[in-house]
A protein has these predicted regions:
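Terminal, low-structured helical/coil segments at or just beyond the last alpha-helical repeat
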Residues: 281, 285-328
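Conserved alpha-helical positions within TPR/SEL1-like repeat arrays
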Residues: 71-82, 108-123, 149-163, 190-205, ...
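N-terminal leader/linker segments that initiate helical-solenoid repeat arrays
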Residues: 28, 33-75
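Amphipathic alpha-helical segments of tetratricopeptide repeats
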Residues: 56-57, 97-102, 138-140, 178-183, ...
């Protein structure tokens, strides 16, 4: 787990990456940040968020340089976004950008803030502003000569185009990002994995299921090696591979994969609204597979979870914002 003291002493943010869930389940960032194949639990995420909330109270000029304060607010936005607290994430990102535009301007950090804001807009269904932010982040990185950061912009643009069902554009940018990440020894593992999943999802959108399945199988092997068999990324890979088999017409191969994937996601993601949409797809699959009793049990679980989540105003509002259906 990242040490908060490292941020204070070295003035660096150690992870500003998007969630794999955002990539593959159309806008549900969840399950915690990942760094070097280590996953933060919900408790870890809450604890780190609390630390950064405390730090943000004094993260203003003249108490510290604007760029340092901006990085603290930027990372706080990432933590809020990973927890699904979208409104607070937007406020944190916008405040970070105000700080980061104070001279001397840090172009890499400002581009990161724009990039993160773009992913947040995409998660909440604001695709027009998302595309505007992502393209501006890409232009800023190109103008500043930040070649190592360009693949991340391609990756996030691919994700956005996936939301918009522009599968050809998504495939082009995902392929470009995947090739760049595969050649970069310092690329974060979640970026390597995420681009494979975006690439596979774009192929699913255009009904090229054999090609999608091949990429998902590669992603599953990578996920198992990086994270282990019981962690959220592996559960998501497993579920998506099952989904691709289902849509290709192979319900026999799909069944155990979707069941296992949903079980893993239930253990690692069950606290988050995103899990409702996993269950919804699984219930629909069970209906198609003529497993009516099993489907009914899942549908009852969905109703119970939705009732519980709707009883919490912030989460209930978030459920209305999440636009996961675009992938399915």
């Amino acid at each position: 787990m990242r040490a908060f003291s490292m941020l204070c002493s070295k003035f660096v943010i150690l992870s500003r990456s998007s969630s794999i869930i955002l990539t593959c389940l159309a806008a549900c960032s969840a399950g915690g940040l990942r760094l070097n194949a280590q996953i933060l639990t919900q408790e870890d995420l809450q604890n780190e968020t609390a630390e950064y909330e405390v730090a943000s109270r004094s993260a203003e000029p003249p108490h510290m340089p604007p760029v340092v304060a901006g990085r603290i607010w930027l990372h706080l936005g990432v933590l809020y976004q990973d927890a699904g607290r979208f409104g607070q994430a937007e406020i944190a990102y916008e405040h970070a950008m105000r700080l980061l535009t104070i001279a001397p301007v840090s172009r890499p950090d400002l581009a990161d803030a724009l990039d993160n804001l773009g992913t947040l807009y995409a998660e909440s269904g604001n695709l027009k502003d998302a595309e505007h932010a992502e393209k501006n982040a890409l232009k800023m990185r190109e103008a500043a000569g930040l070649k190592s950061e360009l693949p991340r912009s391609w990756y996030h643009l691919a994700t956005l185009y996936l939301h918009q069902h522009r599968s050809a554009n998504a495939r082009e940018f995902a392929q470009r990002a995947a090739e760049a990440f595969s050649e970069d020894r310092n690329a974060l593992p979640e970026n390597k994995l995420g681009t494979l999943l975006v690439l596979a999802s774009s192929l699913c959108q255009s009904h090229q299921y054999p090609e999608a399945i091949a990429h998902l199988q590669s992603a599953l092997q990578l996920s198992n090696n990086l994270y282990g068999p019981e962690q959220l990324p592996t559960g998501l890979n497993t579920f998506l591979l099952g989904y691709a088999y289902w849509k290709s017409g192979d319900l026999v191969s799909a069944n155990p994969l979707m069941q296992r994937g949903s079980d893993i996601l239930g253990k690692t993601l069950g606290w988050h609204p995103a899990y409702l949409f996993v269950l919804t797809q699984y219930a629909q699959f069970l209906r198609k597979a003529h497993q009516q009793d099993a489907a009914h049990a899942i549908e009852q679980e969905i109703k119970q979870k939705r009732t519980h989540l709707n009883s919490e105003p912030k989460i209930g509002q978030q459920l209305q914002m999440i636009d996961i259906a675009v992938l399915f």
